[in-house]
Amino acid sequence: MVFDELITEFDRGLRSIAGVSRMSRPVPKPAAAAPAELSAAERKHAAGLMRVNHVGEVCAQALYQAQKLTTSSAGLKEMFEHAAREEEDHLAWTAHRLKDLDSRPSLLNPLWYAGALAIGVVAGRLGDKVSLGFMAETERQVESHLDGHLSELPAADVESRAIVEQMRADEVKHGKSATDAGGIELPMPARMLMRAASKVMTSTAYYL
């Protein structure tokens, strides 16, 4: 059973890095009028932001995989799996949007994935309450990060905006689930370290 689980997660990891994701929900579409034409500068900026979001979803897959593998609770395994499936939708959506913008995912995705997997294992080994607290804090920081992107995206890029808005709604839900399941609040130094690591990732992934 454990071996089968490892094989499944290994396959998911390879697909995350390679950009071959399974979409269980369709790409969110803007409710309003047809998308407007973006200038070259707007397309470049939108692509940079969506590349950052794609990297975030690569990391989310690694984190949830690690947390799922390190918990002995069947209920938490199911919760992490459900969140990972929704995050895989995000991965597929952002990859789809990058292609529409004639851009590409980060060249450093294997590095981001490996780092997030290691962090997830450490969080999981510290116990379920810490692991859930880490999940809740991660989702809070992602929510804030997506709020920033919603204000930065070109006004005409309603397609990217629709994707980010649905991603944000899902992240809020995941964070609440982690808190409701018993996640503790992480100490301030840990939260600050997470923000610093996120800053390095986002500033690098925008370009690479």
UniProtKB/Swiss-Prot annotation:
Domain of life according to the entry: Bacteria
Metabolic or biological pathway: Cofactor biosynthesis; ubiquinone biosynthesis
Subcellular localization(s) per the UniProt record: Cell membrane
Pfam families, sorted: COQ7 (PF03232)
Keyword Transcription regulation: no
Binding-site list for Fe cation 1: 57, 87, 90, 171
Topology in the lipid bilayer: Peripheral membrane protein
Catalysis: reaction(s): a 5-methoxy-2-methyl-3-(all-trans-polyprenyl)benzene-1,4-diol + AH2 + O2 = a 3-demethylubiquinol + A + H2O
Main location, first listed in the record: membrane
Record key words, sorted: Cell membrane, Iron, Membrane, Metal-binding, Monooxygenase, Oxidoreductase, Ubiquinone biosynthesis
GO molecular function: 3-demethoxyubiquinol 3-hydroxylase activity; metal ion binding
Annotated binding of Fe cation 2, by residue: 87, 139, 171, 174
Signal peptide extent: none
Entry similarity comment: Belongs to the COQ7 family.
Protein name: 3-demethoxyubiquinol 3-hydroxylase
Organism field: Burkholderia pseudomallei (strain 668)
Gene assigned in the entry: coq7
